[in-house]
Amino acid sequence: MSENYLHTTVLLDEAVKGLNLRPDSVYLDGTFGRGGHSRLILSKLGAQGRLFAIDRDPAAIEAARAIEDARFAIIHGPFSAMAEYMAQRDLLGKVDGILLDLGVSSPQLDDPERGFSFMRDGPLDMRMDTTRGQSAAQWLAQASAEDIAWVLKTFGEERFAKRIAQAIVAHNRQQPMTRTRELAALIADASPFRDKHKHPATRSFQAIRIYINSELEEIERALDGALTVLAPGGRLSVISFHSLEDRLVKQFIRQHSRGPQVPAGLPLTEAQIAAQYQDQRLLKAAGKMQPSAREISDNPRARSSVLRFAEKLAP
């Protein structure tokens, strides 16, 4: 596979800075991609520092093999399994920082053979890991209109989900779709209104990709795993690219950073509350950032990104 696709890492310095790196500590890049964050982390680690990286994309694993550094190790698999991978290395509760850069990467979008983009014709695949699971074409060929509409509405917030789903099923009864441009044209024809600022297939392609890769479930499992993997005082740095991702991250941090949930109106002193309601906070929210106008100008794909930080509290 050609790797001539340019990739500019979004919020590169900010995400790494948010880890509060210590030279001889252990870090985890849960989404290696093409290694922008990993390379910057390695440049700041000392001789005893270690960096583990995870990615389920075989092309990312191939790119990672170009890093010849004894402090670095790449793991092929989903980031949702980070707790399992770190347990195998006796590192549960010992990792000082985790970075997650969610969603699809520019090389994946720009490579027509991956099937993520409606702007370039290619096989209708959309799998992050091309070695397993069903492709988008395979799923669309056997899914009902009701199931397709639910996916488009739930993961793409597509207001014409039912019309588009019915058109897909009707087309596939005649001849199953196998190409991205074919699907994009069908969605455009089925959409009664056009947004001049957005291609009519944008939301549907996002929704199908999220469903095929179980992206939101993967994020939920990864965030839960991060709590187990992080050492006390360890930092979590997460970049999201659309509202569904960011909502999960925001809710997770909020859920684990709230103090004791005490029913309102109880006639208790602070000392009594402390004695009866255990403080179960596991995280401390540590800030939020968005890209600068300059970064958005240089890299328009950064426009929707949000970076959130959290810190694991000592027990």
Curated annotation (Swiss-Prot):
The chemistry this enzyme catalyses reads: cytidine(1402) in 16S rRNA + S-adenosyl-L-methionine = N(4)-methylcytidine(1402) in 16S rRNA + S-adenosyl-L-homocysteine + H(+)
Q: What class of enzyme is it?
A: transferase
Q: Name one GO molecular function term.
A: rRNA (cytosine-N4-)-methyltransferase activity
According to its UniProt entry, this protein's organism is: Sodalis glossinidius (strain morsitans)
What subcellular locations does the record give? Cytoplasm
One of its Pfam families is Methyltransf_5
The protein here is known as: Ribosomal RNA small subunit methyltransferase H
| Source organism superkingdom | Bacteria
Give the gene that encodes this protein: rsmH
